[in-house]
């Protein structure tokens, strides 16, 4: 026999009907309860994921060509900290080193480029930052 203060089997757990307590029921489960009860809320029907339209998915996205490391492609090209024009290609307009996902360098040559840029900065060939803002 259920105790009167615990609510019956169809009341939604501890604390009576729609208490918002621990049980399931209409109150919304663990601490949910609150305003209006039920599961609708004020968000309306959002529909299933399938009904939202958009692309069918599958396949690759159109990112264009894969970037190739210019130092691996042209074996004659070497990373040189003294070549300011070459090193500026791997710097943003604010003086930051461009990451390899954008520059297309392989890991080996990206490390060499970063080291060369840092050497060039120390010798005042390349800027640490851009001048006045």
From Swiss-Prot:
Pfam families: Ribosomal_S18. One of its GO terms (biological process) is translation. The keyword Zinc-finger does not apply. Residues 40-59 have a biased composition (Basic and acidic residues). Residues 9-39 have a biased composition (Gly residues). GO terms for molecular function: small ribosomal subunit rRNA binding; structural constituent of ribosome. InterPro entries: Ribosomal_bS18, Ribosomal_bS18_sf. Residues 1-63 are annotated as: Disordered. One of its GO terms (cellular component) is cytosolic small ribosomal subunit. Keywords: Ribonucleoprotein, Ribosomal protein, RNA-binding, rRNA-binding. PANTHER family: 30S RIBOSOMAL PROTEIN S18, SMALL RIBOSOMAL SUBUNIT PROTEIN BS18M. Belongs to the bacterial ribosomal protein bS18 family. Part of the 30S ribosomal subunit. Forms a tight heterodimer with protein bS6. Binds as a heterodimer with protein bS6 to the central domain of the 16S rRNA, where it helps stabilize the platform of the 30S subunit. This is Small ribosomal subunit protein bS18. It comes from Anaeromyxobacter dehalogenans (strain 2CP-1 / ATCC BAA-258).
